[in-house]
């Protein structure tokens, strides 16, 4: 059963944020997690609730893709199919609870001039590519053709990707293990201090 949860933001020229929440979370379970990673508590809310709250606060249209699919490519294709009239898409895995609304706006704005936009966060170890990855409407057919576990990598190869430097550790703070959850908890506490 598909549960399409979309905002009612009135401007159709904005891209739609696709929140992907259909993965199995096997690495989290293997690390000792007792619930699905998206249902794990981070402070007083679940990981997914943090992500959705940040997306809602952005004011951008959004869609939650939470039906089980064989791979991330299948999830992206299903979400694009469900929002086929969108003016573009920001693909955001549901396990990125610290994403800033400002970053969502920056990626959306960059899509006005580039077909594919990837946020990049600078660390001491180097530059890390993160999410959400933005896709302009011209990428629609390529996104609809995605299958399997490689996500949108084929679309990035076809269209190229413009890297957008952002000051948002939330773009690279995904929750795959209990250790990731602990790290996110410390980062969240630092933001709230």
Name the predicted role of every residue range.
Residues 9-129, 160-168:
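Nucleotide and nucleotide-moiety/phosphate-recognizing core
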Residues 2-17, 147-193:
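Conserved alpha/beta core of the MobA/IspD/sugar-nucleotide pyrophosphorylase nucleotidyltransferase superfamily
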Residues 29, 144, 185:
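A short local structural element in Rossmann-fold oxidoreductases
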Residues 104, 139-143, 181:
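A generic structural signal for short hydrophobic patches within well-formed alpha-helices
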Residues 22, 35, 135, 175-176:
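Single, functionally critical "micro-switch" positions that shape active/binding sites
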Residues 128-159:
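Short, glycine-/small-residue-rich phosphate/pyrophosphate-handling segment
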Residues 41, 98, 134, 174-175:
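Short aromatic/basic micro-patch
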Residues 65-66, 92-93, 133, 146, ...:
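Active-site-adjacent beta-strand anchor residues
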């Amino acid at each position: 059963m598909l549960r399409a949860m979309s905002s009612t933001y009135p401007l159709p020229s904005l891209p739609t944020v696709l929140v992907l929440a259909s993965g199995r979370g096997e690495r989290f379970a293997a690390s000792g997690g007792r619930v699905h990673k998206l249902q794990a508590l981070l402070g007083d809310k679940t990981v997914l609730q943090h992500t959705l709250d940040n997306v809602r606060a952005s004011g951008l249209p959004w869609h939650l893709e939470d039906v089980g699919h064989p791979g991330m490519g299948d999830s992206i294709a299903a979400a694009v199919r469900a929002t086929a009239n969108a003016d573009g898409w920001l693909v955001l895995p549901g396990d990125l609870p610290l994403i800033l609304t400002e970053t969502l706006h920056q990626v959306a704005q960059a899509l006005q001039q580039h077909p594919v936009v990837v946020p990049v966060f600078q660390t001491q170890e180097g530059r890390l590519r993160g999410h959400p990855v933005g896709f302009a409407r011209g990428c629609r057919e390529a996104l609809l053709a995605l299958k399997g576990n490689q996500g949108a990598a084929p679309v990035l190869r076809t269209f190229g990707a413009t890297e957008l430097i952002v000051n948002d550790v939330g773009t690279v703070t995904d929750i795959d293990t209990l250790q990731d959850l602990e790290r996110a908890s410390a980062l969240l506490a630092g933001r709230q201090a």
